[in-house]
Structures are given as structure tokens and as C-alpha cells.
A protein has these predicted regions:
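Polybasic/polar functional segments that serve as interface/processing modules
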Residues: 1-110
Length: 110
């Protein structure tokens, strides 16, 4: 199976969010070919979550799991640590009061 480049996937993800009028932006740009992606959801009430993609061997599929959920400050501190560990990492921040992120949508989930 052919894999999409990270930069292509992010471009498609941001477009899908724009189509739903969900603001999002890149806060850290990583490796354009194979950089890992963390998506931070900021609900604009002092709370946030971040998601990362992981492989479920039992179900033989990729899925998005929660890396951390808590105050915006806690999530930002976690992301700061992740950025120092992985220089190729991309971080996308989504701002939505309802917490919508579309990561479970067809074409984005796996």
C-alpha cells in the first residue's frame, strides 16, 4: 500500500477542517515526508487534548489515540516535551468549542 507523505495528509486535513469552518493551524512543521503528527484540540475554555496516531495490531488498523487531556497548560507542556524528543514532529492545533477534530472521519482515521 502506498503511503501519503505527511505534508500531503496535513494539507488534506486542514482543507477538511476549513470546509467544516473549524479553525486550525500548524504550530510546528516537521519532516515533510514521514514526520509524525500530533493534533491538539483547544476547546477555548482552558481545556485541551492532544491525539497521536498509533497502530492497533489486534484490529490491524491505524487509529488516533489521546496522548493527553487536561488544562491547556498541561497539554502545551506535554507538546513541548514531545517537540524536543522528535525534531521531525508536526503539531496541528484545532480550535473548536465543541471539540470537533474530524479524526474519526473517513480518509482521516486510518
Amino acid at each position: 500500500m502506498t503511503r501519503l507523505t505527511t505534508e500531503f495528509w496535513i494539507s488534506a486535513y486542514l482543507k477538511r477542517l476549513r470546509l467544516e469552518a473549524i479553525p486550525a493551524f500548524i504550530t510546528k512543521k516537521g519532516d515533510s515526508i514521514s514526520g509524525a503528527v500530533i493534533v491538539k484540540i483547544n476547546t477555548l475554555d482552558g481545556r485541551a487534548q492532544s491525539f497521536y496516531k498509533t497502530y492497533n495490531f489486534e484490529l490491524d488498523e491505524w487509529r488516533w489515540d489521546i496522548l493527553i487531556s487536561g488544562s491547556d497548560l498541561e497539554v502545551e507542556n506535554s507538546l513541548k516535551k514531545q517537540k524536543t524528543i522528535d525534531q521531525d514532529l508536526w503539531v496541528i492545533e484545532v480550535e473548536d468549542r465543541e471539540g470537533r477534530h474530524l479524526l474519526s472521519e473517513e480518509g482521516l482515521a486510518g
